[in-house]
Structure formats: C-alpha cells, structure tokens
Amino acid sequence: MAGHSKWANIKHRKERQDAKKGKIFTKLIRELTVAARQGGGVPADNPRLRLAVDKALTANMTRDTIDRAIARGVGSNDADNMVELSYEGYAPSGVAIIVEAMTDNRNRTAAEVRHAFSKCGGNLGTDGSVAYMFERKGQISFAPGVDEEALMDAALEAGADDVVVNDDGSIDVFTTFADFISVNEALAAAGFKGDEAEVTMIPSTTATLDLETAQKVLKLIDMLEDLDDVQNVYSNADIPDDVMAQLG
C-alpha cells in the first residue's frame, strides 16, 4: 500500500510536544511503574513492560532511571492505586478525540479533561460516542532509507496486517493489537528495528483540516497532553502537509 502518511501530521505535532522532556519522562516513568506492578519486573516476561522500556530508551531516558521506575513498581503499592481510564469527545468541527489516562484520582482527572475540552471549544462525550470510529492497532515506523522490499517481505512473513510506504519514503507497518509484540520482535530479529513502535488507535475515517481548524484542534490536543494524568491522545484529524508547514 502506498500513499501520503495520514499519521505524519500527528508525528510532527508530537515532536513539538516532545520538547517538554520532563513531562514526557513523567508519563513514561508512570507507565514503567504500573507495567512492572501488573506484570512483574522482568521485561522478557512482561510484554507491556518490554514495550515501555523500548519507548523510554527511544526517548533517551537513562537505563538507571528506567531500572528505578521498574523497581518502584515491583516494590511499592503506589501503582495499585492507579487506574486506567479513557475519555471520548469532539474537538472543534467535529474532530473525534480519545484520551487515555492513568490516575489515582478519577474526579480530578475527569474535571481536568472536561475543562480542556470546554476551554478549547470541544465537547466531552459519553463512553462509546467516538470509540467505534477507531481500531486499536500496533504501528511500527521506519525512517526513509530502509530497504523497502526486504522490510515488506519480513513484515508480511511476521504476520503484519499492512505495510504503508509514505510519500517521504518512511514506512509504517501495522499489526493487530494481539500480534503487535510478536511482529515487532520478529522484525527486530530480522534486522529491522523500528524508529518508533507503539500501540495506537487508528481511525476508520479521517477529517481533513484547514489551517484555522487545525490550530484549534492542536490547541486542544496540546492542552490535554499537558495534563499529568493523560498518557495518550488520539484523533481522526488529517492535517495536509501544506497546512502543517504553516503551523510551524
């Protein structure tokens, strides 16, 4: 499959967000701690923890910091107080939004998420209001320059659902949620270590945004991601390259 990267715009926006390194690390440490608490502190035996460690290393977190977070999860009851929640709603112009949070205070998190939607011209919806528009999938991304044919062969042999070659030469490998870990590890064993590997929510349909709407939607997404309890924000926004260039 070929085409322009529908998800590239989100990656560009995430690069801006990643500048807030301290906040990103806080979220990663929380995921490491909870993953270790729930599935044990040995990454080889805990797929969720293994993925969390990979993401932390990709973000340039030191191994010492990672090990301390894992040790905290195994040896502390703090992670037991954490619950994982999701919220659904609409950004301006009806763009669908899903927010995933990890919190020890449901009321605080709900109030903060609701405030962000309200302040940015969106609406917090009920459970199921937009979830039907998304499918949870694994996504493994490779920068331009990778051997396209060899990667495609390896991905399909490993059980990938789809391989998308983007206009800029980057490649995204998509998997079912259940097969994500096995496909990612099979690709790594074949010499294809993704620049980014994550479980994400892929929309079945997208909303193409103009500059004004994109600014409003990204303002909401940025505000949501600034919340300490929020781990991930997904949308069905598709921002064309020319609009993204104007956003800077």
From Swiss-Prot:
> Biological process GO annotation list?
cellular response to iron ion; regulation of DNA-templated transcription
Superkingdom assignment? Bacteria
Q: Pfam families from the entry?
A: TACO1_YebC_N, Transcrip_reg
- The question of whether Membrane is a record keyword is answered with no
Q: Which cell locations does it reside in? A: Cytoplasm
Q: Does the keyword DNA-binding apply?
A: yes
User: What GO molecular functions are on record for this protein?
Assistant: DNA binding
| Keywords (A to Z) from UniProt | Cytoplasm, DNA-binding, Transcription, Transcription regulation
Give a GO cellular-component term: cytosol
This molecule's function is given as: Involved in regulation of the quinolone signal (PQS) system and of pyocyanine production. Negatively regulates the quorum-sensing response regulator pqsR of the PQS system by binding to its promoter region.
Instruction: State the HAMAP family in the record.
Output: Transcrip_reg_TACO1 (MF_00693)
Spell out the NCBIfam families in the cross-references.
PRK00110.1, PRK12378.1, YebC/PmpR family DNA-binding transcriptional regulator
Similarity annotation: Belongs to the TACO1 family.
Could you identify this protein by its name?
Transcriptional regulatory protein PmpR
Q: Which organism is it from?
A: Pseudomonas aeruginosa (strain ATCC 15692 / DSM 22644 / CIP 104116 / JCM 14847 / LMG 12228 / 1C / PRS 101 / PAO1)
> Which gene does this sequence derive from?
pmpR
